[in-house]
Amino acid sequence: MNTQLNEIWQKTLGLLKNELTEISFNTWIKTIDPLSLTGNTINLAVPAEFNKGILESRYQTLIKNAIKQVTFKEYEIAFIVPSQENLNKLTKQTESAGNEDSPLSVLNPKYTFDTFVIGNSNRFAHAAALAVAEAPGKAYNPLFIYGGVGLGKTHLMHAIGHYILEQNSSQKVLYVSSEKFTNELINAIKDNRNEEFRSKYRNIDVLLIDDIQFIAGKERTEEEFFHTFNALYEANKQIILSSDKPPKEISLEDRLRSRFEWGLIADMQAPDLETRIAILRKKAQLENLTVPNEVIVFIADKIASNIRELEGALNRVIAYSSLTENEITVELASEALKDILSANKAKVLNCTTIQEAVARYFDIRPEEFKSKKRTRDIAFPRQIAMYLCRELTEMSLPKIGEEFGGRDHTTVIHACEKISEEIESNSETRRAVSEIKRNLLGK
């Protein structure tokens, strides 16, 4: 974001604060971040689609008028929810408008190390990201971050970009999604601009590519990225990649997969209750919102899936409070989230549904759990299924044993103890159990 735009926005906020009630200003206006100026349009980042809808229908004219008072000029404004797709569109518009700045893609101003909440589920990934940001090209190269949807991978990617530029603004940092990389390559081939494409991606200091798993199966993209990777790596330039799965589970050429494993691999898990509470407190603090502690604990306890849905639930509660002009209480939060909570309750968990979910994850048949087979490809998933039956249902140990081919309750105890130990010591097991639980709970 440029300095001029920031000054305009700060003055605009001053005007809007005098026009609106405190709760309306804090709920809707203070959550906006100025992103960029494209032609005659000011692009404003908002936290969710719900906010975007309210702002467009109720506050757009007010904001435009305030900006006009500050600048003495008529500007259009665009509210953007900073998903990768929208950021890609914005980057493309900015480039077409003749922006000759460094090749940095639009970074979400909210995604910094300062706003990242550290917990057991992401501590290692955060430490690795910070180490890379402090010494790009020298610490871990490449850094490969993986984990499920909405767990903070993109936040860390943006945070690395921000940190590097804060330390040295002359660094050429390029952040893109794998989809954008692929689309630019296709256009370069079509328009005979291959050298221009290669120059863009190989004459930089730091390359961050989100969702790298999507290049799998795209032969030309894999080939081009292989050579891009080599060029940057040999020049000691930093490469950071993110994915929803570890390199060995992505269907890539062996030579590319092995390169992804050259540096450091860090996984991110679903946040535990304490981290979820800390995330909600941080969000409320950053947006200057007063949310009672019991409401934060209530939301954190009910929404255990991922950070994106967790923050979305808080936004929903705050919006509901603002629109109904009622105080934020546990009762109000329960009412605001009733469709989400009832959907979660509707999920019936029993041994059969757990066995099916585990079997689906490991690509085996549920009947195998009741067989006498003891090979690891069957025994290990069976132990995970037993562990989840024990954790997620009220079934007794003997009853669980019956559901697994009439096995003794001591076998179930052994399975639960083994998987508990594996979760503590093995990130692959931890990730598998976490993902299966998310699938089961619909989170």
From Swiss-Prot:
Segments for region (Domain II): 75-105
SMART domains: AAA, Bac_DnaA_C
Location of the region described as Domain I, interacts with DnaA modulators in the Swiss-Prot/TrEMBL record: 1-75
Subcellular location(s) per record: Cytoplasm
Keywords noted in UniProt: ATP-binding, Cytoplasm, DNA replication, DNA-binding, Lipid-binding, Nucleotide-binding
Pfam families: Bac_DnaA, Bac_DnaA_C, DnaA_N
GO cellular component assignments: cytoplasm; plasma membrane
Gene3D superfamilies: 1.10.1750.10, 1.10.8.60, 3.30.300.180, P-loop containing nucleotide triphosphate hydrolases
Entry GO MF terms: ATP binding; ATP hydrolysis activity; DNA replication origin binding; lipid binding
Domain remark from Swiss-Prot or TrEMBL: Domain I is involved in oligomerization and binding regulators, domain II is flexibile and of varying length in different bacteria, domain III forms the AAA+ region, while domain IV binds dsDNA.
HAMAP family: DnaA_bact (MF_00377)
Family membership: Belongs to the DnaA family.
Subunit structure: Oligomerizes as a right-handed, spiral filament on DNA at oriC.
Name of the protein this chain belongs to: Chromosomal replication initiator protein DnaA
Lineage: Bacteria, Bacillati, Bacillota, Clostridia, Eubacteriales
